Amino acid sequence: KIRKNSKGKKKFILHDGPPYANGHIHMGTALNKILKDMIIKFHQMNGKDSIYVPGWDCHGLPIEWKIEERYKKKKKNKDEIPIKNFRKECRDFAKEWIEIHIQEFKRLGVTGDFKNYYSTMSFEAEAQIVRELGKFLLDKSLYQGFKPVLWSTVEKTALADAEVEYLDHTSNTIFAAFKIKNTDKDFLKDANVIIWTTTPWTIPANKALAYNQSIEYSVVEIDNLENFKEKKIIVATNLLESIMQSCKIEKYKIIKKFNGSDFFGTSCSHPFLKIGYDHEIPMLEARFVNLEQGTGIVHCAPSHGPDDFNLCLKNNIPSKYTVDNAGLYTKEVPTFPLIYRATPQWFISMEKNSLREKAIKAINQTNFYPKKGKERLMSMVEGRPDWCVSRQRVWGVPLPIFINKKTKEP
């Protein structure tokens, strides 16, 4: 009736950012919908044809988890359920919660055309996604790459940054010694480069050490070897005192101070040399190395971190699989007793066909309320890496790409 009476007037359209269809609305959802309804009604009372377009986000892990919980209660194995059946259950589950949400929104007094809502799981929406993906494939913006991505070892899938919440966690840290193997500097011979890491499990994936040429380093001789097995070590001069305190070493002396540039051409042995890690570890210059914490030398595991990956890629150092889908070490880890993770994924390039430039232009043409929203979105787009669009899951829009089983090429 409102639409009929408002026909011909200037339109104001609020296209809703969709809630997720997997449970009852909460206080945040209610606040969101009430505020939007107030805006819609204000413009309607102000003489406009004010339209609210409701919608729901229906794909993804949260709904899969709910269906998996049902299987667990019935003592069923999800992997034994035909994919077609699993997807139907996910679709039915999402549809059920959309209907519940509609009733809950109406109880809040929200006005909208709830008979003609949009949903990401509608066949029309899924078909449009495939069409748009095809455009990226044809203009070569869509490509398969091997990069570190956020990985869930429980669900065995890549994740988006927006799907992750960072929690404070206390982890064990270690210092590790990399014995210098090759160098043209006499004062570096027989010394051990010391690194500090909060992720000891990445040591088997180490392929390089990073230093900063503008940092001053010291060759140090330790008298008390109780906490360090190596007598001659190398760390950043400015961090030496804190390292000695952390390791409870009281007696030591500085043999020589030198600039990071003297590391050029130096390579080390892996700490696990005696159990099969016989590859050389080159020392590489990197500006991301700083004096905020650690030793001033960074251990690089290219399959577990974006900075490490990019540095090794730049220096033609290959990554290798050391952790599988479940977060367990693979057979690539030699004779070792038993997470960013580098995996082959599909990406949309932000640089190809000026996608980043187009996105920034669109942001600048948009009015934001409040204006801080623009700053936040702009910073995300300006600095974001290529967009990982693939997931190792069932409930989503499949990538319509065929892979040759023999060559593994698309």
What residue ranges belong to the model's regions?
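Residue patterns forming the tRNA-binding/recognition surfaces of aminoacyl-tRNA synthetases
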Residues: 1, 68-204, 224, 265-268, ...
